[in-house]
Amino acid sequence: MKKENVKILGIESSCDETAVSIVEVSKSDKGKILSNIVFSQIDEHSPFGGVVPEIASRSHVETLNPLIDQALEEACLKIDEIDGVAATSGPGLIGGLIVGLTTAKGIALGLNIPLIGVNHLEGHALTPILTNDISPPYILLLVSGGHTQLIMVKSIGQYSQIGTTIDDAAGEAFDKAAKFLDIGYPGGPALENLAKKGNNKKYNFPRPLQNSSECNFSFSGLKTSLIREAKKIEPINDGTLADLAASYQEAIIDCIKIKSEKAIRKILKENQNTEIQYFVASGGVASNKAIRDSLEVIADKHAMQFIAPPMKFCTDNAAMIAWVGGLRLLRGQKDKLNIPARARWSLEELSLIHISEPTRRS
């Protein structure tokens, strides 16, 4: 694309947040967030203790168009001043993805502007370049409600997975435990807050796969262990509940630390001729302060700088979608109007798509 800067309207609807953002992206791989609107569906899902896909989809339908108007107003732009529209096309809940992607297709068709379908995971993976002004290569821990992965980000569009979860993601481990303990929704923040009041050494929960040489995670057995322990000591008073939460969170953190350190050692050994300065955490669970603090210690140990986006850009947002859409559009990539929504879509599949070398950052 010949333009030096593009203004991209981004739409995120892969789960239970409806989000719209406008980001100005330059060929030097720098971005300016002009607006960033997020509508949370917490109140709608709270009675059920988790996300109900049909309710999520209906809420996206009801709120998306007003949010687009709000984002344009906040950015002081008219719709015809947008250079392209990007929407999450996977992975995620298929109903929500269809709502956002269909809306983006309508805008692209009506304005005759490019459409870019964005991988939600790539949005999280590249957010630190936008928010923290860093450049690849870097080692990424992508830790969210549906994914827990260790990834080598070689460049924009080139990713190598070092480890992933073989069952539940870390975010699921938080959410399912919180639902079982009946401590509130959303479960992750509720359990984190409760853990602050407890003794994290009170219960000795397992650290699955800690002795495995691989960098994969497993959280399902840990969750089962918590349920068994809680049933042994019923009824549970407030102090015991806090101790359970603290000990459980500590076990999750240890699992993340153990595997992150193995991944760092592996990547640094295999890339001795490449300077890798950053260990990055992104995704909703990366907003957990205890996890951030533990990862910073690991980064320091390996003479790396720990980077995590501001908390509002760790959780789902549309700025990351607009950002990736702009990066890809400036590299000559756009999608046809028949691009499908995809419930599953790995980052490594993206690496099979040719993408030009990123412009040198000034």
Label each PLM-derived region with a short phrase.
Residues 5-81, 87-91, 120, 124:
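N-terminal beta-alpha supersecondary unit
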Residues 18-24, 140, 148-152:
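Short beta-strand scaffold segments in enzyme catalytic cores
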Residues 309-347:
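Glycine-rich phosphate-binding/hydrolytic loop that grips phosphoryl groups
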Residues 353-362:
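Single conserved hydrophobic/aromatic residue that forms the stacking wall/gate
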